[in-house]
Amino acid sequence: MGQPAAAQGSMVVAVDTHIVMIPSPGGPIPTPLPSPYSGQITGGTVATVKVMGKPAAVVGSVDQNAPPHIPVGGPFQTPPQNQATVRTGSATVLIGGQQAARNLDTATTCDDVAPTAPKGQIVAAGTVLIG
């Protein structure tokens, strides 16, 4: 059985790790801290194919983290980009020449420790199912 198809507005969720510079008497200490990521797919969709009335999401679709990551205890070592990109999709269904994105497919986020690891996961719901 297939998974619900992702579309513009579907969510990507993850827990990123960002390096925060924690103040100390000996100078700032780079400290990896978890940061929740939650954003809606907003770009890189296929406007000519609709899923529940919205443009279909595919591998390469992007989203923005909202609200953006907030450093706790000090400034970020490198400010996060607060963006994710869908990296996996259906092996059998193409939309606009790209793999269709579905619920539970993965995305890379702005994680500092493993920026190319697919830590994010799509959360999509609806009646259109894709295998």
What are these model-derived regions, one by one?
Residues M1-G131:
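Intrinsically disordered, low-complexity proline/glycine-rich segments
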